[in-house]
Design a protein with these regions (language model features):
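Core AdoMet radical
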Residues: 71-86, 93-114, 119-161
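Flexible, acidic/Gly-rich N-terminal and inter-domain linker regions that tether
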Residues: 1-62
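Active-site cofactor/substrate anionic-group-binding motifs, chiefly glycine-
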Residues: 42-96
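Residue-identity detector for glycine
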Residues: 17, 24-25, 34, 45-47, ...
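Short amphipathic alpha-helical segments, especially helix-boundary/capping motifs
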Residues: 9-14, 41, 63-67, 95-99, ...
Protein backbone atom coordinates (compact mmCIF):
# COMPACT_ATOMS: atom_id res chain seq x y z
CA UNK A 1 0.00 0.00 0.00
CA UNK A 2 2.91 2.36 0.72
CA UNK A 3 3.95 1.94 -2.92
CA UNK A 4 0.58 3.31 -4.09
CA UNK A 5 0.74 6.18 -1.61
CA UNK A 6 4.27 7.04 -2.75
CA UNK A 7 3.26 6.95 -6.41
CA UNK A 8 0.22 9.11 -5.75
CA UNK A 9 2.41 11.58 -3.87
CA UNK A 10 5.13 11.77 -6.54
CA UNK A 11 3.13 11.36 -9.77
CA UNK A 12 -0.17 12.79 -8.46
CA UNK A 13 -2.02 10.20 -10.50
CA UNK A 14 -3.30 6.66 -10.08
CA UNK A 15 -5.58 4.52 -12.22
CA UNK A 16 -9.19 4.08 -11.17
CA UNK A 17 -8.40 0.55 -10.02
CA UNK A 18 -5.45 1.71 -7.94
CA UNK A 19 -7.54 4.44 -6.33
CA UNK A 20 -10.21 1.87 -5.44
CA UNK A 21 -7.53 -0.35 -3.93
CA UNK A 22 -6.23 2.56 -1.88
CA UNK A 23 -9.68 3.62 -0.71
CA UNK A 24 -10.88 0.13 0.15
CA UNK A 25 -7.69 -1.41 1.42
CA UNK A 26 -5.74 -1.64 4.61
CA UNK A 27 -3.08 1.02 4.89
CA UNK A 28 -0.90 2.80 7.38
CA UNK A 29 -3.05 5.84 8.24
CA UNK A 30 -0.12 7.71 9.74
CA UNK A 31 1.89 7.26 6.54
CA UNK A 32 -1.03 8.26 4.29
CA UNK A 33 -1.95 11.31 6.36
CA UNK A 34 1.71 12.32 6.57
CA UNK A 35 1.95 12.29 2.77
CA UNK A 36 -1.30 14.24 2.48
CA UNK A 37 -0.01 16.78 4.99
CA UNK A 38 3.16 17.31 2.92
CA UNK A 39 1.01 18.11 -0.12
CA UNK A 40 -1.17 20.48 1.91
CA UNK A 41 1.85 22.34 3.27
CA UNK A 42 3.43 22.58 -0.19
CA UNK A 43 0.38 24.22 -1.76
CA UNK A 44 -1.30 26.00 1.15
CA UNK A 45 1.32 26.41 3.85
CA UNK A 46 0.39 26.51 7.50
CA UNK A 47 -1.40 29.86 7.65
CA UNK A 48 -4.89 30.34 8.98
CA UNK A 49 -7.21 32.50 6.91
CA UNK A 50 -10.04 34.26 8.69
CA UNK A 51 -13.20 35.09 6.80
CA UNK A 52 -16.06 37.15 8.10
CA UNK A 53 -19.29 35.34 7.23
CA UNK A 54 -22.31 37.57 7.01
CA UNK A 55 -25.55 35.63 6.76
CA UNK A 56 -27.55 38.22 4.82
CA UNK A 57 -30.84 36.33 4.55
CA UNK A 58 -32.51 33.07 5.46
CA UNK A 59 -35.23 33.38 2.84
CA UNK A 60 -34.90 30.82 0.08
CA UNK A 61 -37.04 29.94 -2.92
CA UNK A 62 -35.91 26.31 -2.79
CA UNK A 63 -37.35 23.52 -0.70
CA UNK A 64 -34.42 21.19 -0.11
CA UNK A 65 -35.53 18.77 2.61
CA UNK A 66 -32.16 18.68 4.42
CA UNK A 67 -31.93 22.47 4.72
CA UNK A 68 -33.09 24.47 7.73
CA UNK A 69 -33.93 27.53 5.61
CA UNK A 70 -36.02 25.59 3.07
CA UNK A 71 -39.09 27.41 1.81
CA UNK A 72 -41.58 25.14 3.62
CA UNK A 73 -39.93 25.41 7.05
CA UNK A 74 -42.62 27.42 8.83
CA UNK A 75 -40.67 27.30 12.11
CA UNK A 76 -37.78 29.37 10.74
CA UNK A 77 -37.83 32.97 11.93
CA UNK A 78 -37.11 34.77 8.66
CA UNK A 79 -34.83 37.76 8.35
CA UNK A 80 -33.20 39.80 5.63
CA UNK A 81 -30.36 42.21 6.41
CA UNK A 82 -30.55 45.70 4.99
CA UNK A 83 -27.73 47.16 2.96
CA UNK A 84 -26.79 49.33 5.95
CA UNK A 85 -26.75 46.28 8.25
CA UNK A 86 -24.46 44.42 5.86
CA UNK A 87 -22.10 47.39 5.48
CA UNK A 88 -22.07 47.81 9.27
CA UNK A 89 -21.05 44.14 9.63
CA UNK A 90 -18.18 44.81 7.22
CA UNK A 91 -17.14 47.84 9.29
CA UNK A 92 -17.11 45.74 12.46
CA UNK A 93 -15.32 42.89 10.73
CA UNK A 94 -12.64 45.18 9.37
CA UNK A 95 -12.04 46.59 12.85
CA UNK A 96 -11.59 42.99 14.07
CA UNK A 97 -9.03 42.27 11.36
CA UNK A 98 -11.08 40.38 8.79
CA UNK A 99 -9.95 40.95 5.21
CA UNK A 100 -12.41 38.66 3.47
CA UNK A 101 -16.14 39.13 3.76
CA UNK A 102 -18.44 36.29 2.72
CA UNK A 103 -21.99 37.42 1.98
CA UNK A 104 -24.03 34.27 2.31
CA UNK A 105 -27.70 33.43 2.19
CA UNK A 106 -30.49 31.47 0.59
CA UNK A 107 -31.72 32.05 -2.94
CA UNK A 108 -33.58 35.23 -2.05
CA UNK A 109 -34.97 37.17 -5.04
CA UNK A 110 -34.93 40.36 -2.96
CA UNK A 111 -31.18 40.65 -3.54
CA UNK A 112 -31.25 41.60 -7.21
CA UNK A 113 -28.11 42.05 -9.27
CA UNK A 114 -28.43 45.82 -8.86
CA UNK A 115 -28.63 45.60 -5.07
CA UNK A 116 -25.74 43.14 -4.85
CA UNK A 117 -23.53 45.09 -7.26
CA UNK A 118 -24.14 48.32 -5.36
CA UNK A 119 -23.18 46.65 -2.07
CA UNK A 120 -20.11 44.99 -3.55
CA UNK A 121 -18.91 48.32 -4.95
CA UNK A 122 -19.43 50.05 -1.61
CA UNK A 123 -17.49 47.36 0.24
CA UNK A 124 -14.63 47.38 -2.28
CA UNK A 125 -14.51 51.21 -2.37
CA UNK A 126 -14.30 51.43 1.41
CA UNK A 127 -12.04 48.40 1.88
CA UNK A 128 -9.94 47.93 -1.28
CA UNK A 129 -7.61 45.58 0.59
CA UNK A 130 -10.46 43.15 1.26
CA UNK A 131 -11.86 40.27 -0.76
CA UNK A 132 -15.59 39.77 -1.24
CA UNK A 133 -16.89 36.22 -1.59
CA UNK A 134 -20.54 35.53 -2.36
CA UNK A 135 -22.58 32.42 -1.65
CA UNK A 136 -26.17 33.12 -2.66
CA UNK A 137 -27.17 30.01 -4.54
CA UNK A 138 -27.71 29.51 -8.24
CA UNK A 139 -27.89 32.60 -10.41
CA UNK A 140 -27.52 33.23 -14.12
CA UNK A 141 -24.12 33.43 -15.80
CA UNK A 142 -24.88 37.09 -16.55
CA UNK A 143 -25.51 37.70 -12.85
CA UNK A 144 -22.14 36.17 -11.90
CA UNK A 145 -20.43 38.36 -14.52
CA UNK A 146 -22.10 41.52 -13.22
CA UNK A 147 -21.09 40.80 -9.64
CA UNK A 148 -17.52 40.01 -10.70
CA UNK A 149 -17.39 43.29 -12.65
CA UNK A 150 -18.66 45.09 -9.53
CA UNK A 151 -15.67 43.73 -7.59
CA UNK A 152 -16.64 40.32 -6.21
CA UNK A 153 -13.57 38.10 -5.94
CA UNK A 154 -15.12 34.65 -5.52
CA UNK A 155 -18.43 32.84 -5.71
CA UNK A 156 -19.03 29.78 -3.56
CA UNK A 157 -21.65 27.65 -5.29
CA UNK A 158 -22.66 24.68 -3.20
CA UNK A 159 -23.97 21.58 -4.87
CA UNK A 160 -25.53 19.40 -2.21
CA UNK A 161 -27.70 16.34 -2.48
Amino acid sequence: MKELIDRLYSARDLSDGELLTLIGGEYDEKYLFGSADKVRRKYYGTGVYLRGLIEISNYCKNDCLYCGIRRSNDKAVRYRLSENDILSCCDNGYELGFRTFVLQGGEDAYYTDDIMCRMIKKIKDKYPDCAVTLSLGERSLESYKKMFSAGADRYLLRHET
